[in-house]
Amino acid sequence: MNLKLFPVLFFCLLFTSGLFAIENTKDTLTNQSNKPLRSYTTTRLTTARPTIDGVLNDACWQTGEWAGDFTQLLPTEGAKPTQNTKIKILYDDKNIYVAIRAFDTEPDKISRKLGRRDELYGDMVGINFDSYHDHRTGFEFTVTAAGQKIDLILFNPMAWDMNWNAVWYVKTGLEDSAWVAEYEIPLSQLRYSSDKEQVWGMHVWRWIDRLSEESDWEVQSMSGPGMLYAFGELKGIKDIPKSRRIEIMPYAVGKLKTFEKVPGNPFADKGRSWLGNVGLDAKIGLTSNFTADLTVNPDFGQVESDPSVMNLTAFETLYEEKRPFFLEGLNIFKFEMGDANLFYTRRIGHTPEYKPELGENEYLKYPDNTSILSAVKISGKTSNGLAVGVLQSLTANENAQLFSGGKTKDVRVEPLTSFTVGRIQQDYKEGNSTLGAIFTATNRFINDPYLEGMNRNAFTGGIDFLTQWKEKKYFLDAKFIGSAISGSADAISNLQLSSARYYQRPDAGHLNYDPKRTQLSGQGGSLKVGKGSGLFRFSEEITWKSPGLELNDVGFMQMADRVEQETEISYFVNKPVSIFRTYSVGIHQSNNWDYNMNYENSSFFFTSAFQFLNRWGIAPSVHYGTDWLNTRILRGGQAVLIPAIWEGNLMAHTDVSKKFFVNLSASKEKAGENHFTSTSYEATATVVPYNPLRLSFSLNYTKNQDNLQYVDTKVLVAGTKYLLAHLDQKTLGATFRVDYFITPEISLQYYGSPFASVGKYTEFKEITNARAKNYSDRFEVMHPMLLGGNYVFGSYSISNPDFTFNQFRSNLVFRWEYKPGSQLFFVWGNERTGWKNDANTKVGNAITQLKDVASNNIFLIKLSYWFSL
């Protein structure tokens, strides 16, 4: 069958089966939508405010209305909960007060396990306010039975941001046959309209850990289009003042770095250095629904290091954001399209791009990150449904210190740079449709000729549109993006030659490399249509990116010059059936072309997940990829035909509510012609020997054998040679965590992660006929001589590419939230990194040899103090 016709035939089949399912499947959402919304009418506080101590003996709790009659969501949707729950809500001009009484006929089995803040752990109760009442944003305040806080922002359809840390007060306590939670939530932590009488969306839920049971005050459905659409209503809030909140948090930090002494190096001859810093974070309520966040000279040190990675591809590794300023409230700035994102926050304050080459007896003190002078973001939503977000950040002229000829001088390694991001989204048709736009600008003020390889100005923009119909069952999601980059000829040449596009590819007739260009522009987009609620769901999507599209100045994108088509079908069962508590199955199919519609490959996935009645679970999946015309493997050379590949994966876990539980995973990949094989295993065990202490250990091992691993490109008089080899790579990693919780506010945590990867290159090859029908005709096996650490191939040579990379990273962190919003940290960070150009070490021995690698340490103390005006 012609694979180019497959998406058309597949979509026809999908559409037919979708119509059948619509006609014959009882849709939980439809039945749910016909039920009236639950509502709760709160009472204004007329007595003294409660003392937040987890004991409901204050006079105010004798007023107001208790509400109950929760409905089970898990494990049996719509059933009566096994335990009763009651809530009461009061308010005044400053706070919302909440009491939740979680009854339990077996109080000795209440799970009061301590965990980190924002960790869903043990028995829990929570309340979520959709204070905009727009069915798009919910502010959640959850507490565990042990008293640990969990706060998050909920978004539809089923996404959340757990990095939002509000300042609020809660205590828990025990009664004869219940546990209780007593809240004080400042109105300053919420955003709401200026209406005289407020109506908010409200969701209240409870989790019983030993039963894996969730019950909700309002009726929710796992098959719905999103939780916020099914929220109940909170009424009765009247005449509350407009919020003009001002929150300020200054901080001070001191660091001691220790490292290996290097005689003659003035930056390392003492083996230590002292650093100190002060700064300020502020949050200003411009109106009751718009907030400005400001940071001056921020401390963006990360408490936990990035994981170790051995990246042998041509593409950048995407790392998770961990800095609070760039985490909180940034959901509005998200604009993702496939693997591309117009705003990747780690571009701001990144490691400097330029690094000078050193001569003999020269030493360099190089900054880890670019200094952020200031950053401001303004975000909020009007009563008419217009969401607005603006972020602006300025990073400094960053200098390294170069010691040469007995003197030290500053060398500019990153120019002064301005980053601007703007985002708007307008709701229509009672939240069923949204229209939005985004704009980003990166402006570098370059005054040094050797920095002209960087882009001077980069602008990107996009428009997105989402509409839903038939009670939000069906949706159409459309995005259109564009970019315009300007800079020197060197800068634009770098973009043309980069792995995102490789304009120099000799067999890409639609591409034209021009070394004199000073501008580059491109566009892209995606169209997705499908059924997004109910037990049966499907979608069809097409995504395209023109060759000139470039997002990487303040966004993230690995590949341009792409057209992708994807089809997804899934079926979910959300009630116990036979031995299963829940299960889901899915099919995913995709086709890929370059922008000139030259076919590259197709992929087919089968995924599934099963949870058993004993709360153990497994998730098997299978992937098949057809023969692949890989346009990136030679990093600028012609496309190479790669054999088809099979992949199988299996994940399994035991009951995570137990004091000891295990997660396991295994995968196997194998391509035809013995082109590629990969086997990987990972196991994680977690044990809670007694309540305040938790231990976790994970071990992972991967073995890869790649017959066409890229090595080098040599431009010779006789022509360009693309050199590849057979790579045998083994990777071993482990992670050990210890968490000890003295109280919910005081904890001691340790994280340690050794990592090693050993790679041996053999059977070197030159590409001869990249698309030959027979695999062995696509290359010629070479027989170089190894002389003095170099492989000699006659007219050229390369250094030995074998490697042994090992690294150890660890953190020991003492945290004390001595008052809400204010913290004291003591941190010890340790890192050891080794590298050798040989593969004579077994990967396990490379781990043990870390003890002989020089150690770098950071000892840090940080104090922050939060107050409001």
Question: What feature does the model see in each segment?
Answer:
Residues 21-427, 434-437, 853:
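Structural preference for beta-rich elements and adjacent junctions enriched in aromatics
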Residues 221-242, 398-458, 468-471, 531, ...:
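Outer-membrane beta-barrel transmembrane domain signature of Gram-negative proteins
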Residues 169-174, 261-283, 449-456, 516, ...:
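Outer-membrane beta-barrel proteins
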Residues 371-373, 379, 458, 469-471, ...:
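Exposed, low-structure sequence patches enriched in small/polar residues
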Residues 7-18:
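Bacterial N-terminal signal peptides
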Residues 214-216, 305-308, 400-404, 447-451, ...:
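Short acidic, glycine/serine/threonine-rich loops at helix termini
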Residues 1-5:
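Positively charged n-region of N-terminal signal peptides that target proteins for export
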